[in-house]
Amino acid sequence: MFELFADSTPNARKISIMLEEINENYSITFINLNKGEQFHEDFKKISPFSKIPVLRHENQTIFESGAILIYLANFSGEFYGLNQNLTTQWLMAQMGYIGPMLGQHHQFHHYNPGKSEFGEQRYFKIAETIYKNLDDHLFNNEYLAGEYSIADIATFPWIARHPIHEIGLNKYLNLTRWYNKIALRPAVIKGYDL
């Protein structure tokens, strides 16, 4: 049995979606980020940077959502793709660029509007560029790394925030197709609902 330490965030949803995709039983221990529970000493013992998600399985604890996805893909033998190098590239693009930049956009536009015109404009433009880059890539690709994989599972929860990104999907037809196809997967529907 797996234990997922999470809150209702895109990074945590990656893991609940993956656990649903591989049909594994798991429990969720909610860490309330708004109350600062991630900074409690007990939690810092399993997450040195005070971040969620964290996954506990048997005698090991894994932190960082990308590392957890790779662990679960290796554990299950699923969703790492036929070309693991390509899958890893797209997973790392999500971990190092897509997620952090959309997260910054969210901070400036949703939590702190009007505090920094420079920040709002910068991250809005970056968010638009991310949407366009993904749309361009998906013109010739059904999924990010060829077949449905942990790269898509990692990226989907961030694009699912498109209504609050104030960008929308209307002008990104390939990204919309990709998003709608993944959104219909039963495991995604169940796993997204943390």
Q: Would you name each region that the model predicts?
A:
Residues 97-186, 191:
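GST-like fold's C-terminal all-alpha helical module
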Residues 1-121, 135:
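GST-like domain detector, emphasizing the conserved glutathione-binding G-site
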Residues 87, 193-194:
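Short linear loop/turn motifs
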